[in-house]
Amino acid sequence: MGWPVSRAIIRTFLLLALGLLGLAGCSLLEPQPQLVIPTPPAATPALFIPDASGQIVTDPVSDVVPTIDPLIEALIQETSQQQLIAYVRQMESFGTRNAFSDTQSETFGIGAARRWIFNEFLRVGNGRLQVEFQDFPMSYSGYSADQSNVVATLPGAGGGNGVIVIMAHYDDRPADATDGASRATGANDNGSGVALLLETARIMSSRQWNQTIVFLATSAEEQGSFGARYFAENAFLDSENVIAALNYDAVGGRAGIPQHVRLFAVEYAISRHGALGRYYEYIAGLYLPTFPVLIQDALDREGRWGDHREFVAVGFPAIRVIESVEDPELLNSNRDTWDLIDYNYLQRVAQINLAVAANLAGGPQQPQPPLVAGMAEPGAFLLTWPVDPVAAGYAISFRPVDSIYYPTFKFVKSENAGNVALTGLDPNVTYAVSIAALNDRGLLSGFSIEQFVGPDAASYNSGALSSVP
């Protein structure tokens, strides 16, 4: 589908508008006005005409189910606390990483930090990572400074066309967001996220994956998520198929805090962001069941935000992961030092990230939504979809819309898939229906966009109940 105006005009508009925006970052309480960009056309699945002569399989049973993959488990065990400690200490050693700090020194300021991150991606990338700076302008509170994201891309090798973005902002700040001279330690916020990002890149670069993975270190988050906005808007304009954006910000933990993480996803029950959050929670529970993911049905903490909001704004599925409890006394303070972080906690967050990213990147393609039709029997539905020849089976989800978690899945082998009837559902309940593909190692793809059936299906399918892309 063509756009009513040229892509060049849209890009020019975005760059001009970017210079006019400048509000506080993740640590302040004034929300940032979001840039209004052209709304993407509604996703239209490829034309699929069901085979009326195909055999219908009713209430199938399958032994092809999600399982712990030994190769992914081995990668998880490679996560090194020593590496994480070294990365956080290195980030703190730059003195400050404020967006307005020195860019020429080799040892102090944001310029030294970004060059070190760039070189570290090259060092750990096993010759597979394509590393580049993504430069952009930033104006904030009457000041301007050129900025750079550091982007490391691990191209997909299995024919997949999805892009998984794993991100963490590398800048920090003292109390004054424009103070580029004063010391700003920024160990947990967000040296911990950068450490996770680099350690994940080190481990995942040792393998090839079906989908493309982008490791994104963003700048100027503290002044208003400028770097994430620039990346997300350009990915949107370039028609990138971002299937997941995972934001890690302040994930280091401290001694004595509850052993879980919080996951923020806006409009969790009905949005694509919520679907990504459910997938994340499910895979995390499979691989690290003793380190729970607690779902937060919100874009972020009240009055706060992070880089993922820029991906939400352009319609890419995006979530934020953050430690279980924050210490407000450490926020934008020089007390936020490397020695207060719980590296066992940070290691477990990194392991969850590896499990989720490896399943998304190593599993089959995300299926297109099935056609769902009610049958004569109340509570019975027929699902029809094209079967991926690479898939070994499928998971089918009939999720009551008032439930934020997945129900018990129904499973079907590929040879029985494509025309499946499920019975025994409650005809008085509105369900969100989706499917995911499984490979022969038990890796689960992302779930298809949910289709709604039941008494209130029309309201949900029309999008009238949602306020986000």
Where are each of the predicted segments found?
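Active-site-adjacent substrate-binding region
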Residues: 254-369
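N-terminal hydrophobic or amphipathic helices/low-complexity stretches enriched
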Residues: 29-108, 124, 155
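Acidic/histidine-rich catalytic neighborhood of metal-dependent amide-processing enzymes
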Residues: 144-149, 174, 180-271
